[in-house]
Curated annotation (Swiss-Prot):
Protein name, as recorded: Protease Rv3090
Organism: Mycobacterium tuberculosis (strain ATCC 25618 / H37Rv)
Hydrolase found in the keyword field: yes
Bilayer disposition of the protein: Multi-pass membrane protein
GO CC field: extracellular region; plasma membrane
Transmembrane segment boundaries: 2-22, 37-57
Enzyme class, broadest EC rank: hydrolase
Coiled coil: none
Length: 295
């Protein structure tokens, strides 16, 4: 019951009592005062009744209209609206909602999910959604308040959808170590959520930027990454050895085909070491000597 209708009832009662004193035989002063009170009470009741015939709905809000507590099935958008004084309006937020389930300080609101390897993890999740005005009366009848819609409709179904998609996700699968599967898993969760609650709310997107595994799974992932790194190093060493062997083979063939290659390599090495290159020519009796400074 609105406050206007309460004051209307009070004014009517006062007017009724004053009217009795006005109509009953009594002195002129009493009757005059009773008449004044009656007229004033009736006028006040009319004013309060008039004030109860209008309501204003705020920006980006819906208002659910009820008559004596029973929903009428009418939802009002933002603006100025007329109604009966005995009708009440209940606001519902019609703006786009951005809900984040993250860890901030000592408050941890992350969603627990069970993975394909039977371990559990904590997922950082954000979701953008908006209430549909056409579904607002039904949602009010089921959940009464907007916060109950968020907790019992959005959060509960979001948790169910995330657990459904993460049940098929194995964090130890090598394919999941190359490319993060979180964007595709979040998209699938959003699709499931749209199927479940899409008739009542608009689901714009679901995001899972990070996920924290339990310690056992984290250790196994680190071991896999170390093994993959060692394998990469071994493969690179193998390719280097193969390239070196091929280079040696090419060099060996070039020496056999052209002895001057040996002479050139000898001269280069002798010059680099400060040794005389005289002994590098085939058939030469000279021996390489070490240059003595100052002689």
């Amino acid at each position: 019951m609105t406050w206007q209708i309460v004051f209307v009832v009070i004014c009517v009662i006062v007017a009724g009592v004053a009217a009795l004193f006005w109509r009953l035989p009594s002195d002129d002063t009493t009757r005059s005062r009773a008449k004044t009170v009656t007229i004033a009470a009736v006028a006040a009741a009319a004013v309060f009744f008039f004030l109860g015939c209008f309501t204003i709905v705020g920006t980006r809000q819906f208002a659910i209209m009820t008559t004596f507590g029973r929903p009428t099935g009418v939802s009002l958008n933002n603006g100025f609206h007329g109604k009966w004084p005995w009708q009440m309006t209940h606001p519902m937020d019609g703006a786009v909602q951005i809900d984040k389930y993250v860890k901030e300080g000592n408050t941890d609101q992350r969603i627990t999910v069970r993975l394909g390897n039977q371990s559990t993890a904590l997922a950082d999740v954000s979701i953008r959604w908006q209430l549909k005005q056409a579904a607002a009366p039904e949602l009010f009848q089921q959940y009464k308040t907007f916060d109950n819609v968020r907790v019992n409709l959005i959060e509960r179904n979001l948790s169910v959808a995330l657990n459904e998609v993460f049940a098929g996700f194995n964090p130890l699968d090598p394919r999941n170590l190359d490319v993060s599967p979180l964007p595709s898993l979040a998209k699938r969760a959003a699709d499931i959520l749209r199927q479940d609650v899409g008739g009542q709310v608009d689901i714009f997107d679901v995001n899972v930027p990070t996920i924290q595994y339990d310690q056992s799974t984290e250790d196994k992932i680190n071991q896999l990454n170390q093994q993959r790194a060692q394998t990469s190093i071994a493969l690179e060493a193998q390719r280097t050895a193969e390239a070196q062997a091929k280079a040696n083979e090419i060099l060996s063939r070039s020496i056999s085909d052209d002895p001057n290659v040996v002479v050139q390599n000898c001269i280069t090495a002798a010059i680099n070491k400060g040794i005389s290159p005289l002994g590098c020519w085939p058939g030469s009796s000279a021996l390489p000597t070490i240059a003595v400074p100052g002689r």
